[in-house]
Amino acid sequence: MVFGFCAKCARPKMAVFQAFGGYQTRAGYGVLLGFAAAPICFDLKNLKYWLGPVAWDLTRCQSAQDQSVGMESSLVIIPVLNEVSYLWPLLNNLRAADPLIPVWIVDGGSTDGSVQRARLMCMKDPHLNLLINENRSQAHGVNMAAQCAYRQGYRYMIRMDAHAEYIHGFSTQLLRVLCDKNADSVTVPLIAMSQQVSGWQAANAKLQRSRLGHGNAAHRQNTGSGWVQHGHHAAFRLVCFQALGGYDTRLEACEDVDYDRRLIAAGGRIWQAGQLAVHYYPRAAPLGVWAQMWRNGKARAALWHKDKQWPQIRQVLPLGAALGLCMVPFSPLVPELALPAGLYLGTLCLATLFIGPRAALLAFVSHMGFGLGLLFGIFSIRAASAKARHT
């Protein structure tokens, strides 16, 4: 019996063989040692992996192992919340290109039948699994999937959104980019589109493609490929993701922004693959847009407080618009106070000529939601800090 290591899965295995009639001769022992040493030599590139997380150094987490691993070392996770209408088309598209890649659906408390649909699909697809995220938030769900995948020996995690469309062979091309560029994470441009010719979703998609919606964020436009500071998450090295502790689950949103900042600060590198742009379906209801932007505003305030960094101008403008409207009731006393609100509303009226009245109205809803959420988040943090100082 020979105790060796499997070069494919980097785990111990028992190999039984006989060389030239037995182990009694010196030649037999030589062959024995040669065959036993070969898989270990082939697997030295995976030494850090099968020894476990020992003093992991981010600058060295990418190595020659990329040249020998393939799709068998990766999996796809799909965070889901009430997206039953999108699941089936996404899985069909994915399976047409990658029929064997493991796919984990991570449900965060759907009430529209997504769980039932996922279970039916799992019965037909042996490589499809359903995980229930009892903590509900997307950060918790991704962290849970990443931890399970890392323990099972996966090295790369591909994240896909249910409410999106991907090019054929997306996962294979994405993994190739990650390995070729020796990156720690790969992001992709996120371009809004609609299933409707008209209606609120079409208006929201048009808004998200304009500067009033994305604020000139680079990853919301197809600006090409290159090294970036942030983008829409698509692929991770699990060793890097785990070493950084995954997403910060204390954040309601913007956990991707926080992760990218920590990754860059630790010496990691993020590559944006412009050729793999994702087209996604935004929210269709104004109330849903408001709730999303309110949550994003609060999370952005928490992120500023955590990082102690000055915000970008495009993130402050919605707050300025909200404060400008709040000053309108005092304009009879000081007429100049109406100027900011007038300038903002005039800009929205002008925007209707280019993006239409519905998109302009959604711009108002999203700006107010983000601005007031940001203001609420700032005051909440200050109140919590003051309370902590007095206890």
What is the meaning of each model-derived region?
Residues 92-101:
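Short, acidic, metal-binding catalytic loop of nucleotide-sugar glycosyltransferases
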Residues 107-116, 164-167:
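A conserved acidic beta->alpha catalytic loop
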Residues 133-151:
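Glycine-rich, basic loop-to-helix element that forms the pyrophosphate-binding segment
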Residues 154-165:
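Short beta-strand-to-loop acidic/aromatic patch adjacent to the donor-nucleotide binding site
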Residues 169-202:
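Conserved donor NDP-sugar-binding/catalytic core segment of glycosyltransferases
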Residues 216-236, 252, 278, 309-311:
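A recurrent flexible, glycine/aromatic-enriched loop bordering the glycosyltransferase active site
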Residues 248-311:
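Catalytic donor/gating beta->alpha subdomain of glycosyltransferases that bind UDP-sugars
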Residues 321-385:
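Membrane-embedded multi-pass helical conduit in multi-pass membrane proteins
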